[in-house]
């Protein structure tokens, strides 16, 4: 059900998701790009079919939001009843994950520390980390400066000893 309109691209399942599904389902099989495209189109058509039917069921029950129950009824009415048990399992997993997320976000609220105080503490930690980083950078710079000075002194000392050695050689040449 692909068309040339730009909107259809927004309504397809991401290729990465399809590729992952194919690889998990058929791990030792190579699948041609045309076959992958066909799977994308079939999945998109299936989703459109189910969502349209669920929307009709939702409208008939005078609701404004499609619920999971509407989708399950749509599967049944379209002859996909064999999918319902698995759909219900996935729905339960999604609800569990959502509940865990809500609990995790409420943990922050239940800390008893206002968000402004947490932000202030975070800013203090960032400032302390920046200060420590600046001190380390300063120490490294000083060490590099000292190493450069030592190298200059060593070079000057070597140059002076070379000049002293060559002037003594000239004095020795004068004696001949």
From Swiss-Prot:
<feature type="modified residue" description="Phosphoserine">
    <location>
        <position position="105"/>
    </location>
</feature>
<keyword id="KW-0007">Acetylation</keyword>
<comment type="similarity">
    <text>Belongs to the NC2 beta/DR1 family.</text>
</comment>
<keyword id="KW-0597">Phosphoprotein</keyword>
<dbReference type="GO" id="GO:0090575">
    <property type="term" value="C:RNA polymerase II transcription regulator complex"/>
</dbReference>
<keyword id="KW-0804">Transcription</keyword>
<dbReference type="GO" id="GO:0140672">
    <property type="term" value="C:ATAC complex"/>
</dbReference>
<feature type="short sequence motif" description="Nuclear localization signal">
    <location>
        <begin position="100"/>
        <end position="103"/>
    </location>
</feature>
<dbReference type="GO" id="GO:0051123">
    <property type="term" value="P:RNA polymerase II preinitiation complex assembly"/>
</dbReference>
<feature type="compositionally biased region" description="Low complexity">
    <location>
        <begin position="152"/>
        <end position="167"/>
    </location>
</feature>
<dbReference type="GO" id="GO:0003677">
    <property type="term" value="F:DNA binding"/>
</dbReference>
<dbReference type="GO" id="GO:0045995">
    <property type="term" value="P:regulation of embryonic development"/>
</dbReference>
<keyword id="KW-0238">DNA-binding</keyword>
<feature type="modified residue" description="N-acetylalanine">
    <location>
        <position position="2"/>
    </location>
</feature>
<comment type="function">
    <text>The association of the DR1/DRAP1 heterodimer with TBP results in a functional repression of both activated and basal transcription of class II genes. This interaction precludes the formation of a transcription-competent complex by inhibiting the association of TFIIA and/or TFIIB with TBP. Can bind to DNA on its own. Component of the ATAC complex, a complex with histone acetyltransferase activity on histones H3 and H4.</text>
</comment>
<keyword id="KW-0678">Repressor</keyword>
<dbReference type="GO" id="GO:0017054">
    <property type="term" value="C:negative cofactor 2 complex"/>
</dbReference>
<feature type="modified residue" description="Phosphoserine">
    <location>
        <position position="106"/>
    </location>
</feature>
<comment type="subunit">
    <text>Heterodimer with DRAP1. DR1 exists in solution as a homotetramer that dissociates during interaction with TBP and then, after complexing with TBP, reassociates at a slow rate, to reconstitute the tetramer. Component of the ADA2A-containing complex (ATAC), composed of KAT14, KAT2A, TADA2L, TADA3L, ZZ3, MBIP, WDR5, YEATS2, CCDC101 and DR1.</text>
</comment>
<dbReference type="GO" id="GO:0006357">
    <property type="term" value="P:regulation of transcription by RNA polymerase II"/>
</dbReference>
<feature type="domain" description="Histone-fold">
    <location>
        <begin position="12"/>
        <end position="75"/>
    </location>
</feature>
<dbReference type="GO" id="GO:0000122">
    <property type="term" value="P:negative regulation of transcription by RNA polymerase II"/>
</dbReference>
<feature type="region of interest" description="Disordered">
    <location>
        <begin position="152"/>
        <end position="176"/>
    </location>
</feature>
<dbReference type="GO" id="GO:0046982">
    <property type="term" value="F:protein heterodimerization activity"/>
</dbReference>
<keyword id="KW-0805">Transcription regulation</keyword>
<dbReference type="GO" id="GO:0006355">
    <property type="term" value="P:regulation of DNA-templated transcription"/>
</dbReference>
<feature type="modified residue" description="Phosphoserine">
    <location>
        <position position="167"/>
    </location>
</feature>
<feature type="modified residue" description="Phosphoserine">
    <location>
        <position position="166"/>
    </location>
</feature>
<keyword id="KW-0539">Nucleus</keyword>
<dbReference type="InterPro" id="IPR003958">
    <property type="entry name" value="CBFA_NFYB_domain"/>
</dbReference>
<dbReference type="GO" id="GO:0016251">
    <property type="term" value="F:RNA polymerase II general transcription initiation factor activity"/>
</dbReference>
<dbReference type="GO" id="GO:0005634">
    <property type="term" value="C:nucleus"/>
</dbReference>
<dbReference type="GO" id="GO:0051726">
    <property type="term" value="P:regulation of cell cycle"/>
</dbReference>
<protein>
    <recommendedName>
        <fullName>Protein Dr1</fullName>
    </recommendedName>
</protein>
<dbReference type="InterPro" id="IPR009072">
    <property type="entry name" value="Histone-fold"/>
</dbReference>
<dbReference type="InterPro" id="IPR042225">
    <property type="entry name" value="Ncb2"/>
</dbReference>
<dbReference type="GO" id="GO:0017025">
    <property type="term" value="F:TBP-class protein binding"/>
</dbReference>
<dbReference type="GO" id="GO:0051302">
    <property type="term" value="P:regulation of cell division"/>
</dbReference>
<dbReference type="Pfam" id="PF00808">
    <property type="entry name" value="CBFD_NFYB_HMF"/>
</dbReference>
